[in-house]
Each structure stands twice: as C-alpha cells, then as structure tokens.
C-alpha cells in the first residue's frame, strides 16, 4: 500500500477525516516554502498537496495564479519542486505528498514523462493530480505513473454525471478529489448539504475515499465539509497568507486551526 492508502486506512479505523493542505512549491521562494512544508505535519496536515508552478494554470483562481507567478520569479520549476520533496523526505518519510499541476511542464521537460515519473518516485512523491489530462489520455501519464507505484488522483466536479463518472474513476487510485463548486479555485464557499449526496455517489462508483476541495477557507467550513466526506482540502486560504508575507509560525497556526476543524468532524 502507498502512504496515501496507509493514511486513509489509519483514519478509517477511528472514523477520522483527512486534512489535506495545498501550497505552491517555491512560493515565495525555495527556502521559505520548504520551511512551511516541513511545518505542515506538525500542524495536523495528513496529506500535502504541492503545486508545480506553471505559466498558464487554467483551473486556478487569482490567489493561486499569483503564487505560481511568485514561484516562477523565484526560480521555481518542476525540478525545484522535486528538490523540495527530496529535502522534505530527509526528515519525514511518513507524510504523503501529492504533486498537483498541469501536463505541459511535465511533458515539455527534458526527458519528458518517463524521466518525471522516475524522479518523482525516487524523490518520495506518492501521488499526482494533473488537472488538464482527461481519462481518454490515461496512456500518456496515468498508467505509467501507476505502474511505477504512484497514485493518480482525478478530479470529479458537479458536472461529472453518471455517464462520465465511470471513465473518471476507472484508473484513479489513492482518493478522488471532488471539486465542490463549478469554476476555479478560491471561488464561493462549499455547501456541505449539497456536497454530501455527490460524495456518496462518487464513493460508490470509485470504491475509494473522496476528499472535497474548493470553497473551504475556515475551520468551520472544514469541519462541515469533512463531516460529509473522507476529508477536505484547503488551498487558496493558506496560499493567501503566504502571498501576504505572513510569518511562517502564523501560517502554520492558521493551518493547525483548519486541521482541527477537519479532525473534529
């Protein structure tokens, strides 16, 4: 089993919920980003989602787009994000890490997909979320990644109907990421009552944990959404504090409050 599988198995034994925190790799710079990343497990984060900066992030709202631009300006890249993972793994071999991003910087990188998968596994990455690669293109990255031992996590949305859902979950592993609202990150607040039946539908089709993201920015929202799912993701609210240049302890304190909300569901 992967670290992701182990995490959900451990949580399910006690009825616990997973708290997943997203941050952009190399934002605002490599050292600060690594310092924040290293502090996440101690703040209660169960799974870390680490963004790979890209020039044209179509699914991201203004907050995460700005984070990507800051990271790129600081020399951030897929290679540097993998360096972050390697550095993190020197001190933490338990916390799952999921890289989240877009296909172009993976494909266009020297050595392409094969080199990326090899280096990701060697660095200690556990899973991938590639938001612009549909199931019809599974042979490009999803299947080779899974063969190498990586979980490949897909997004389901409010517009993923029962005809589309089987294709979405067919080669998904680790968990399914349910996008609670239609649109980009940092949008309107998630509604737990609306999310609950969708989570049940996806869980039944995928036979996997379902984690809900988008529209969660407070401990109360984390508690409400995690209560109807297997966990929740917070990204933009954390990235916003990083963008404001808040001290690392303040950022981690905010993350700890969010994690406590999710874990109290």
UniProtKB/Swiss-Prot annotation:
<dbReference type="GO" id="GO:0005829">
    <property type="term" value="C:cytosol"/>
</dbReference>
<comment type="pathway">
    <text>Amino-acid biosynthesis; L-tryptophan biosynthesis; L-tryptophan from chorismate: step 5/5.</text>
</comment>
<keyword id="KW-0028">Amino-acid biosynthesis</keyword>
<dbReference type="InterPro" id="IPR013785">
    <property type="entry name" value="Aldolase_TIM"/>
</dbReference>
<protein>
    <recommendedName>
        <fullName>Tryptophan synthase alpha chain</fullName>
        <ecNumber>4.2.1.20</ecNumber>
    </recommendedName>
</protein>
<dbReference type="InterPro" id="IPR018204">
    <property type="entry name" value="Trp_synthase_alpha_AS"/>
</dbReference>
<keyword id="KW-0456">Lyase</keyword>
<dbReference type="GO" id="GO:0004834">
    <property type="term" value="F:tryptophan synthase activity"/>
</dbReference>
<comment type="function">
    <text>The alpha subunit is responsible for the aldol cleavage of indoleglycerol phosphate to indole and glyceraldehyde 3-phosphate.</text>
</comment>
<dbReference type="Pfam" id="PF00290">
    <property type="entry name" value="Trp_syntA"/>
</dbReference>
<feature type="active site" description="Proton acceptor">
    <location>
        <position position="60"/>
    </location>
</feature>
<comment type="subunit">
    <text>Tetramer of two alpha and two beta chains.</text>
</comment>
<feature type="active site" description="Proton acceptor">
    <location>
        <position position="49"/>
    </location>
</feature>
<keyword id="KW-0822">Tryptophan biosynthesis</keyword>
<keyword id="KW-0057">Aromatic amino acid biosynthesis</keyword>
<comment type="similarity">
    <text>Belongs to the TrpA family.</text>
</comment>
<dbReference type="InterPro" id="IPR002028">
    <property type="entry name" value="Trp_synthase_suA"/>
</dbReference>
<dbReference type="InterPro" id="IPR011060">
    <property type="entry name" value="RibuloseP-bd_barrel"/>
</dbReference>
């Amino acid at each position: 089993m992967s670290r992701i599988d182990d995490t959900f198995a451990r949580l399910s034994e006690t009825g616990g919920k997973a708290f997943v925190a997203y941050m952009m790799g190399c934002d605002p710079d490599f050292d600060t980003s690594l310092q924040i990343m290293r502090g996440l497990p101690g703040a209660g984060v169960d799974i870390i989602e680490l963004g790979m900066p890209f020039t044209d992030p179509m699914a991201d709202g203004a907050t995460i787009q700005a984070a990507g631009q800051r990271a790129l300006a600081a020399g951030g890249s897929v290679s540097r994000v993998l360096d972050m993972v390697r550095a993190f793994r020197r001190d933490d071999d338990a916390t799952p890490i999921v890289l989240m991003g877009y296909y172009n910087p993976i494909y266009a990188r020297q050595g392409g997909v094969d080199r990326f998968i090899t280096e990701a596994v060697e660095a200690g990455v556990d899973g991938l979320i590639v938001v612009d690669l549909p199931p019809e293109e599974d042979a490009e990255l999803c299947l080779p990644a899974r063969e190498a031992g990586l979980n490949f996590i897909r997004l389901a949305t409010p517009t993923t109907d029962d005809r589309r859902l089987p294709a979405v979950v067919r080669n998904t592993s680790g968990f399914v990421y349910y996008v609670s609202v239609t649109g980009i990150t940092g949008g309107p607040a998630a509604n737990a009552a609306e999310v609950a039946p969708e989570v049940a539908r996806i869980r039944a089709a995928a036979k996997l944990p379902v984690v809900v993201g988008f529209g969660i920015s407070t401990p109360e929202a984390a508690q409400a959404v995690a209560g109807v799912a297997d966990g929740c993701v917070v990204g933009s609210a954390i990235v916003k504090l990083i963008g404001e240049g808040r001290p690392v302890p303040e950022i981690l304190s905010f993350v700890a409050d969010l994690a406590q909300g999710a874990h109290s569901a």
